[in-house]
Amino acid sequence: MDSWLLSLLIAGVVFAIFQLRTVGQRPAGCPPGPPTLPIIGNLHQIPNKNTHVQFKKWADEYGPVYSLVLGTTIMIVLSSDAAIKDLTRGVESTHRAQICISVPWQAAGFAWSLCDTWRQFRKLFHSFTHLGAAKSYVPYQDLESTSMMVSLLDNPDLVFDHIRRFTTSLSTQMIYGFRTPRTDDPMLLQMYDGFEKWSTLIGAGPAKLLDVFPVLRSLPAAIRPLYSHALALQKKKSELSFGLWQDAKRKVEDKTSKPCFCVGLVQAQAEEGLTDHVAGMIASSALEAGSDTTASTLTGFLQAMVLYPAAQKSAQASIDRACADRFPTIADMDNPETQYIHACVKESLRWMPTTILGVPHAVTVDDEYMGYRIPKGAGVVYNVWAVHMDPRRYPNPRAFDPTRYMQDLASSAESAQNSDVSQRDHFAFGAGRRICVGMHVVDRSMFLVIARLMWAFDISKAVDVDGDDFVGGILVRPRPFPVKITPRSESRAAKVREAWAACQVLLDQGQQWKQVPEGMPFTTYTGGD
């Protein structure tokens, strides 16, 4: 071998060894964190289950801003309200971190970066969910929550299926223009199966390796079975998303659609040149955002009612003062007597935050905070659990105690805009420019369901329940548990059935809306405004 070639080879090996020596080390100036090991950094310390518990322990030890070294990746963990507010200013950390395994699930990453498609999605979805638009969906929320109540009378053992059907049917009606009237609907089952498989997959050890060692992504597919599995899941998701979009688009063009998000999306496609692929994924993302997380939060509320019967009695007394023997309606939101119900909504979102560690974001420019260096490309995680379990913000934080919000009259959106972040109600909807724009819809849906549940039913435990037993990965929910749901009285059960009977005149034989609900606009899309 020529001496120059040998020298080049030796130099390459030395350089590679030198580079490997730095992998797994915490860069100078970064926030503190647990000790690292060569190559893997802190990867071995990240538990596969109950990650939020360990992240909270590290926050207690290292402070509100700490760092984790995950192979070649730096993760900055924000564990206080002030840190989350300060580090979500402007555009510095608004890109979503690209999680390798989730890229195919997210349609090759379209939703993960601050790009034109993301801006289009935000603009479209805001026009669809702002306060004025949210109020127009009351007929949908009223019918779906009434359907859920009568289903609980008929089949109380399927309570968690009824919750999922409620949130899914409300979402498909608002987004695509059709109801999902059955708990065994194939689309519903496929969607939630995909949610669960993806959430489990993204938290798996091999998936983490692909994230923290990008070089592994170039390995042959045959030795990356997890990534191939993700591609297979994405293929099923794309087929479902594209089919739902094409059907909704056809109905809009045929003028047979009901008012929904896709009416505006068809207009936006023509005006802004969106492809069918992008339009379908935008609609699908809206569906996912509106169904799974709300279902998990409502499941958490049920669990809280089992664990904290005194809170249930207070909620029932609140709605009884407001409604007496009248079936609750959305108008009861404005009744001062229902403040405890509003407090239950806020406390449910605090006590059971489904995005328990937020959604990973990425810093787009070098930054500095509290004297620490925040390097460009670092992942940023909002440690929502740590903030929600901070006893300085919420005394006795693991207790479900709606009274902590009895003086809080602000909506979620109003609270998120409060310049004093210490007064914000919770961080379940995120922060910064990526905050959930569907807050108005969620607040109203949860109020109506909780008010009607508390008015119509007693909720009690069938067996002992562990309030800290969660399942899932990126998105979590309480592990399913036996619960006993019984009508508070025969007269109230009859009132529920009367309300559902009144809804039947609105529906055809397929349980779809016969006509456009009175006063509901076909679209709230405002074009390029």
Swiss-Prot record:
<keyword id="KW-0349">Heme</keyword>
<feature type="transmembrane region" description="Helical">
    <location>
        <begin position="4"/>
        <end position="24"/>
    </location>
</feature>
<comment type="similarity">
    <text>Belongs to the cytochrome P450 family.</text>
</comment>
<feature type="binding site" description="axial binding residue">
    <location>
        <position position="436"/>
    </location>
    <ligand>
        <name>heme</name>
    </ligand>
</feature>
<dbReference type="GO" id="GO:0004497">
    <property type="term" value="F:monooxygenase activity"/>
</dbReference>
<dbReference type="Pfam" id="PF00067">
    <property type="entry name" value="p450"/>
</dbReference>
<keyword id="KW-0472">Membrane</keyword>
<keyword id="KW-0479">Metal-binding</keyword>
<dbReference type="InterPro" id="IPR050364">
    <property type="entry name" value="Cytochrome_P450_fung"/>
</dbReference>
<keyword id="KW-0560">Oxidoreductase</keyword>
<protein>
    <recommendedName>
        <fullName>Cytochrome P450 monooxygenase fsoB</fullName>
        <ecNumber>1.-.-.-</ecNumber>
    </recommendedName>
</protein>
<keyword id="KW-1133">Transmembrane helix</keyword>
<dbReference type="InterPro" id="IPR017972">
    <property type="entry name" value="Cyt_P450_CS"/>
</dbReference>
<dbReference type="GO" id="GO:0020037">
    <property type="term" value="F:heme binding"/>
</dbReference>
<dbReference type="InterPro" id="IPR001128">
    <property type="entry name" value="Cyt_P450"/>
</dbReference>
<dbReference type="GO" id="GO:0005506">
    <property type="term" value="F:iron ion binding"/>
</dbReference>
<keyword id="KW-0812">Transmembrane</keyword>
<dbReference type="InterPro" id="IPR002401">
    <property type="entry name" value="Cyt_P450_E_grp-I"/>
</dbReference>
<dbReference type="GO" id="GO:0016020">
    <property type="term" value="C:membrane"/>
</dbReference>
<dbReference type="GO" id="GO:0016705">
    <property type="term" value="F:oxidoreductase activity, acting on paired donors, with incorporation or reduction of molecular oxygen"/>
</dbReference>
<dbReference type="InterPro" id="IPR036396">
    <property type="entry name" value="Cyt_P450_sf"/>
</dbReference>
<keyword id="KW-0503">Monooxygenase</keyword>
<comment type="function">
    <text>Cytochrome P450 monooxygenase; part of the gene cluster that mediates the biosynthesis of the enfumafungin-type antibiotic fuscoatroside. Four enzymes are sufficient to produce fuscoatroside: the terpene cyclase-glycosyl transferase fusion protein fsoAthe cytochrome P450 monoxygenases fsoD and fsoE, and the acetyltransferase fsoF; the cytochrome P450 monooxygenase fsoB and the glucose oxidase-like protein fsoC do not seem to play a role in biosynthesis of fuscoatroside.</text>
</comment>
<keyword id="KW-0408">Iron</keyword>
